[in-house]
Design a protein with these regions (language model features):
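Hydrophobic alpha-helical transmembrane segments of multi-pass membrane proteins
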Residues: 16-20, 51, 55, 130
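Alpha-helical transmembrane segments
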Residues: 23-27, 50-54, 157-164
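Interfacial segments of alpha-helical transmembrane regions
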Residues: 33-74, 80-85, 158
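Membrane-embedded catalytic cores of phosphoryl/pyrophosphoryl-handling enzymes
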Residues: 94, 99-225
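Luminal/periplasmic active-site loops of membrane-embedded glycosylation enzymes
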Residues: 3, 85-102
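N-terminal transmembrane-helix/juxtamembrane module of multi-pass inner/ER membrane proteins
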Residues: 1-33, 65-86, 122, 221-224
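Hydrophobic alpha-helical membrane-embedded or membrane-associated segments
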Residues: 22, 53-57, 187, 191, ...
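Juxtamembrane/transmembrane-helix boundary motifs in multi-pass membrane proteins
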Residues: 6-10, 37-49, 53, 122, ...
């Protein structure tokens, strides 16, 4: 991986990745959860239960991600690039505390014209390990939940938008120097497993995911949303 390229495209992808980055990821989750509940039209008790289940899936996914990161300890692409071009030893870099890593990134890039200022700040904020991608896991989980929960009710446009958004997040992680392709693949696999379990639990606890008979005619007449 090397920095550089089409800066307007990279900046656009940066804003896509920010929809998942803390603290904006919390707002994204709240909006998506509200939209899911509106689309599914569950009764209040089931809606609250489903909301808790959705957030539990996200929290568990992020916990699994953190556990794997601490075990595998794979350096991010931009850290490898710093090692190759600035002589920053990767093992030394990750032996530092997060604030010290951020300061080191800022110091090494202060005279670097190839890396725009907004990307430097993003690197300073994201100094953890690479494998697997937490951003990908977050976005892929929501996109796959859309397939599992919203597709049966013909919310095709919503599912398509979620897929495009998740793909944008994944592409941004590669092009911004944050992850390798294998990080994205593993994150997507974990997300898929989580979604399978989540949809199974949702059906077991809150009823079938397919619409009840009284909604069938309405859904059949509805334009895809």
């Amino acid at each position: 991986w090397q920095p550089g390229g089409n800066e307007p495209l990279l900046k656009a992808l940066y804003w896509v990745t920010e929809t998942v980055t803390s603290p904006w990821g919390i707002l994204t989750s709240a909006i998506l959860c509200g939209w899911f509940l509106w689309c599914l039209r569950f009764r209040l008790k089931a809606a609250i239960g489903l909301a808790l289940l959705l957030f539990a899936a996200l929290v568990i996914g992020q916990g699994v991600k953190s556990l794997i990161k601490d075990r595998v300890q794979e350096p991010r692409p931009f850290v490898v690039w710093l090692e190759q071009t600035h002589g920053v030893d990767g093992k030394y870099f990750y032996s530092l505390h997060r604030k010290e890593r951020s300061a080191l990134v800022r110091e090494q890039l202060q005279d670097q014209t190839l890396v725009p200022n907004w990307l430097r700040k993003h690197w300073q904020f994201e100094t953890g390990f690479a494998f697997p991608s937490g951003h990908t896991m977050f976005a892929a989980t929501w996109a796959l939940l859309g397939v599992g929960l919203l597709w049966p009710r013909r919310h095709y446009k919503t599912v398509a938008l979620l897929m495009v958004w998740a793909t944008g997040v994944m592409g941004s992680r590669l092009l911004l120097g944050m992850h390798w392709p294998r990080d994205l693949a593993m994150a997507t696999l974990i997300s898929w497993l989580l979604v399978v379990v989540t949809c199974w639990l949702a059906q077991r606890w809150f009823g079938p995911l397919t619409p009840p008979p009284q909604e069938q005619q309405e859904i059949a007449a509805r334009k895809p949303e």
